[in-house]
Amino acid sequence: MSKIILGFVGDLASGKGTLAKYLQEKYHCNTYRFSTMLRDILNRIYVENSRENLQLISKILRENFGQDVMSTVISKDVENDKNELVVVEGIRRPTDITYLQNLLGFHLIYITAEPKTRWERMVKRQENPDEKDKTFEQFLLDEQAEADMLIKELGGKAEKTINNDGTIEELYSQIENILADYGHKN
């Protein structure tokens, strides 16, 4: 079987991480996140992993090393991965897929859910320190950030869309159907 590379683009707290974790646990695939390299840098310099700091370090890297710097790193990691199933999570801008889309077996998947549902999930999970006290209005403002504005545009270019307004079982069923469409045997 040839390699299947699923690239997840999705709104904030839409379920990208949940799906990546599910696939990792069920199929033992590797997952690559654009934010991992950013968190690594922030951790190394002992700076809080807030959403604002993640966006700032991303901007600094892109401005100084090229808009495609993170895409280059991720695509090389994915290309060198020997697994039959690979997940790339956190695609946010067109340059993120510049090199990924040239890899055989790459499929862009858009994951979405209603804003209120996503805000409730974000507050509950508290992935970043600044999320636990965030109001719904602040959440909606965050979605106006540069990278978040491009997500819907990229979502329009995706091969498949997953709507995550239902149950966790429905979410898993949708990804299993997509894998079957791409010839993955479970």
Tell what function each PLM region has.
Residues 11-14:
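ATP-binding Walker
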Residues 17:
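Walker A/P-loop
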Residues 29-87, 91-98, 137-141:
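ATP-dependent small-molecule kinase phosphotransfer cores
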Residues 31, 108, 160-163:
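Short, well-ordered beta-strand core segments
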Residues 68-69, 127-174, 181:
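Small-molecule kinase domains that catalyze NTP-dependent phosphoryl transfer to phosphate-bearing small molecules
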Residues 89-90, 100-125:
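Conserved phosphate-donor/acceptor-positioning beta-strand/loop module used by diverse small-molecule
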